[in-house]
Amino acid sequence: MDNSTDFNSLRGLSVFLLGMMGSGKSTLGELLSRRLQYRFFDTDILIERVAGKKIREIFVDEGEATFRELETQVLAELSSLTKTVIATGGGMVLKPMNWSYLRHGLMIWLDVPLEILVKRLKQDTSRPLLQSTDLDSKLELLLEQRRGLYAEADLRIVVSDLDTPTDIVEKILTAIPTVIKDFHPERDHN
């Protein structure tokens, strides 16, 4: 698929990648932004810049509620941009206010099976919500809490263990034109 077709079909609309931690939002966001010739932002990195500390430190020092507030502030700023791919935090969908910002763009859910998430996150010590707990059970609980919210996305991309990041980006680029025609004019930001 050629880049100009992808770019034109989006008409400058930003793309929000949604999904669980470990679903590949940051990696895929960078690749997708290059293919679309868009800018790329990762909300977790921006939150760390705004707070002047790592996410884990925000959770420890100030709690999850403060982190979620920072997350909303960053999302509010990003939602006004066009031609941008945004990797969101896994819990971005939990706060109702965030949906008003997410609806400014095309929301894509990276639906990764629990077994793959567990495999990817087993050695990751940087995720505050996974500390001092049974990884499988915690991820299963988080996924159950969030699955219905993720399903509100405009597009669902099912990821398998065999998919490379490039394969997944190709799935996204192929699927975008199937949902763009269904957008309401008030959602199309040129």
Swiss-Prot record:
Pfam families: SKI
Reaction(s) catalysed (UniProt annotation): shikimate + ATP = 3-phosphoshikimate + ADP + H(+)
Primary location group: cytoplasm
EC number: 2.7.1.71
Named cofactor requirement(s): Mg(2+)
Pathway: Metabolic intermediate biosynthesis; chorismate biosynthesis; chorismate from D-erythrose 4-phosphate and phosphoenolpyruvate: step 5/7
Enzyme class: transferase
GO biological-process terms attached to the record: amino acid biosynthetic process; aromatic amino acid family biosynthetic process; chorismate biosynthetic process
Any one cellular-component term (Gene Ontology): cytosol
Keyword Metal-binding in annotation: yes
Binding site for substrate: D44, R68, G90, R146
Residue stretches in coiled coil: none
Quaternary structure and partners: Monomer.
Protein family (similarity comment): Belongs to the shikimate kinase family.
Function, as annotated: Catalyzes the specific phosphorylation of the 3-hydroxyl group of shikimic acid using ATP as a cosubstrate.
Protein name stated in the entry: Shikimate kinase
Gene: aroK
